[in-house]
Amino acid sequence: MTDIKSMNMEELKELMTQIGEKPFRAKQIYGWLHEHLVTSYDEMANIPKSLKEKLKEYPITVLEELDVQTSKVDGTRKYLFRLSDGNMIESVLMRYKYGNSVCISSQAGCRMGCRFCASTIGGLTRNLLPSEMLDQIYRIQTSIGERISNVVVMGTGEPLDNYDNLLRFIHILTEDGGIHISQRNLTVSTCGLVPRIYELADEKLQMTLAVSLHAPNDEKRRELMPIANKYSVDELLEACRYYFAKTGRRITFEYSLVAGVNDSKENAQELAGRLKGLNCHVNLIPVNPVRERSFVRSTRQAVENFKINLEKCGINGTIRREMGSDIDGACGQLRKRYMEKTESEK
């Protein structure tokens, strides 16, 4: 089945030709889908009825909103969406002074197996289509009636494990004729799929790459992240240097602090030594407690001390502001609770 919302402009023009229509109709349809964010062909005011009838063979991907939780602390909203095949995914709206940011999922489930992450419990179900990634943003923008200015691909899934669909999503999201979010306002995370980082670098996109590092050496990283058994910290950092050389974009390293595991002064100093000379920034995250995992988050003081020790060694660090902590804010938790509830009611 042709997924019309995942098609770029040239592909839409080809489709118009195939069904006996003028190519200019592609621009109109593209605008309705990606700028006006309509959910049906009937809403496309300047499209003739005869073309609308033809287009009914190509269903528009529209996510079904199952649940929305709103934080009483900071207004963060967590959305649970159902896909057309019944799978569920999560997205998060975060409100900042500079605008509205949405964190989206790139897969239903995840196969990376990071020990502290809820979204990988149960493994990978499937990759999301570009249209399913886009529609998370479109549904939320429509829901709040305000423009989404920033997008973070840091929800459930490993984005670079869904590489081709991710690239298509990025181009539709950032190019003219649609919602047109600047590449500089886009962040894509990865747990460290080294070959894909090189490929992404060669695309020379102007987005931010956020690398989940979480440890200063291979031994500790293997305790937390199975991917570390495949690619060493040295290999990962070399790929990051290549990414910066190709794009000029500073790397962000995500570092989740786990009490007694990776939060000591020595860990900070070792991390700083590894990152020396690399144009980067470290985002420190007290690990989110997950019911099925035994990890304990570092104390506030331990997090502050880690930041101070990094900066003493010349590495910039910030402590991530916690958003939506009262609404199952960590990746995968809302989806998992909903699935458990559904199972218990059967």
Each PLM stretch: what is its role?
Residues 93-94, 165:
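Residue-level structural signal for beta-strand termini and adjacent loop
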Residues 120-150:
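Conserved alpha-helical substructure of the radical SAM core
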Residues 77, 89, 100-104, 112, ...:
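Generic beta-strand structural signal
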Residues 141-150, 155-317:
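Conserved AdoMet/S-adenosylmethionine-binding subsite of the radical SAM
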Residues 95-132:
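Canonical Radical SAM [4Fe-4S] cluster-binding loop centered on the CxxxCxxC motif
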Residues 87, 97, 191-195:
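Short beta->alpha connector loops
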Residues 1-89, 241-250, 255-346:
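Auxiliary Fe-S-binding modules of radical SAM enzymes
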